[in-house]
Swiss-Prot record:
Stated role: Excises uracil residues from the DNA which can arise as a result of misincorporation of dUMP residues by DNA polymerase or due to deamination of cytosine.
UniProt cross-references to InterPro entries, sorted A to Z: UDG_fam1, Ura-DNA_Glyclase_AS, Uracil-DNA_glycosylase-like, Uracil-DNA_glycosylase-like_sf
Record localization: Cytoplasm
Encoding gene per record: ung
Name under which the protein is recorded: Uracil-DNA glycosylase
GO terms for MF: uracil DNA N-glycosylase activity
Residue numbers annotated as active site: 81
Enzymatic reactions: Hydrolyzes single-stranded DNA or mismatched double-stranded DNA and polynucleotides, releasing free uracil
Taxonomy of the source species: Bacteria, Bacillati, Actinomycetota, Actinomycetes, Mycobacteriales
Stretches that traverse the bilayer: none
Main location per the UniProt record: cytoplasm
A GO CC term assigned to this protein in UniProt: cytoplasm
Coiled coil: none
Pfam families: UDG
Gene Ontology process terms (BP): base-excision repair, AP site formation via deaminated base removal
Length: 238
């Protein structure tokens, strides 16, 4: 989606059954119990469209974090909600559409910490983090949609129940999992993760990165934990 393109505005969001959701089939059992909330959210997004406010990311991208197999998730990174700038958000937390410039400042700080932590040169041409997702890193926002230009605007509309179901299910599996929780809002879900090892620090936003995010070494720490759990480390390079 070009940076200057406006958010899509479909007439209606049609999420009647679990089969209507663009998710990997392995997630259906996890999200089926919250299908009522998802239907209500579809009606809410339809109303937002009809009122002229719209939403981000575009409907096909809302559930992108769930398009990878449930059983293959080995790292969970939790964000707040999508980037509110049209053309930026694409359904994965902290990730941007290919070609977005300048990069969001939180993502710039993530790349800075990754370079320091791993001792590598980061030459990412954009902020597309799908290479991480393909290795089993779930980039999940706590709230999956946002009103364009209005950060945190869909908080409390029902997405929290949906993502809580996903986080809880991940924590209950008998498979390796490491959670990276940046900032207080992300750390509030730790109670849903059971005995999952969690890496916590300040958020990478410019307001808080210098208060404990820089120097926290989350990427190398995650790989050490994965190795201890018998899982393949992540190649964080993009």
């Amino acid at each position: 989606m070009p940076v200057d393109e406006q958010p899509t505005t479909p007439e209606a969001v049609q999420w009647r059954t679990i089969e209507d959701l663009p998710i990997h089939p392995s997630w259906r059992k996890v999200l089926e119990p919250v299908m009522d909330q998802i239907r209500d959210l579809g009606q809410f997004l339809t109303a937002e469209t009809q009122a002229g406010r719209g939403f981000l990311p575009p409907e096909p991208d809302i559930f992108r974090a769930f398009s990878y197999p449930f059983e293959e998730v080995k790292v969970l990174i939790l964000g707040q909600d999508p980037y509110p700038t049209p053309g930026h958000s694409m359904g994965l937390c902290f990730s941007t559409q290919p070609g977005v410039r300048p990069l969001p400042r939180s993502l710039v700080n993530i790349f800075k910490e990754m370079a320091t932590d791993l001792g590598v040169s980061i030459n990412a041409t954009d902020g597309d983090l799908r290479p991480w997702s393909r290795q089993g890193v779930m980039l999940l926002n706590r709230v999956l949609t946002v009103q364009p230009g209005n950060s945190n605007s869909h908080k409390g509309r029902g997405w929290e129940a949906v993502t809580e179901a996903a986080i809880t299910a991940l924590g209950q599996r008998d498979q390796p999992l490491v959670a990276i929780l940046w900032g207080r809002q992300a750390q509030a879900v730790q109670k849903f993760l059971g005995d999952t090892p969690c890496i916590t620090s300040a958020h990478p936003s410019p307001l808080s990165a210098s208060r404990g995010f820089f120097g926290s070494r989350p990427f190398s720490t995650t790989n050490r934990m994965l190795d201890d759990l018998g899982a393949t480390p992540v190649d964080w390079r993009l």
